[in-house]
Amino acid sequence: MALLVGCGEDQEPERARAFWDRIQTEDYRSWERAPGYPERSPSRAAHGDMVDIYVNDVVTQDLASPTRLDEWSDGAVIVKDGYEDGELCFVAAMSKEDGEWFWVEYDGEGDTLYSGQPNLCTGCHSLGDDSVRAFFLP
C-alpha cells in the first residue's frame, strides 16, 4: 500500500472551494491526459498507487511549443486523481496564476484537505520543472 502524503494544511479554503467548482464545471476528466499517462497508471509518488493525470488547454499549448520553455504559462492547470486499491481517494490539483502555483488536495468526495502553498507541497514540487514533477517542460 502506498503512503498517502498530503500537502500540509488548508491555507485557502474559499479559493480551494471555488477551484473545485471550476474544475468540475470544466469537466476536467474530459481534458487531455498528461504526457506519459495515457490511462490510469502506477504511481511511485505520494499520491496513491494509481493515478489519472489531466491537463488543461494551456498546458497542452505549452507542451506543443516548438521552443524550449523555462516555465509553464499562467492559466496552466493540472489535476491528478489518486487511487488506492481501485478507489478514488483524492484529487490533487495545481493552478498557475500570476507566476505562482496554487496547490489543493481534496478527498474523494471533493472536500478540501490542503490548499495554498504548504511547505510539504512546495518542498516536493520544487524538484520538478517549474514545480511539475509528473512530466517535463518542452
Model-derived features with residue positions:
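C-terminal motif of bacterial Sec signal peptides marking the signal peptidase cleavage site
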Residues: 4-6
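Sequence context surrounding c-type heme c attachment/ligation sites in exported
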Residues: 8-48, 58, 63-138
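His/Cys-centered metal/cofactor-coordination and adjacent catalytic loops
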Residues: 55
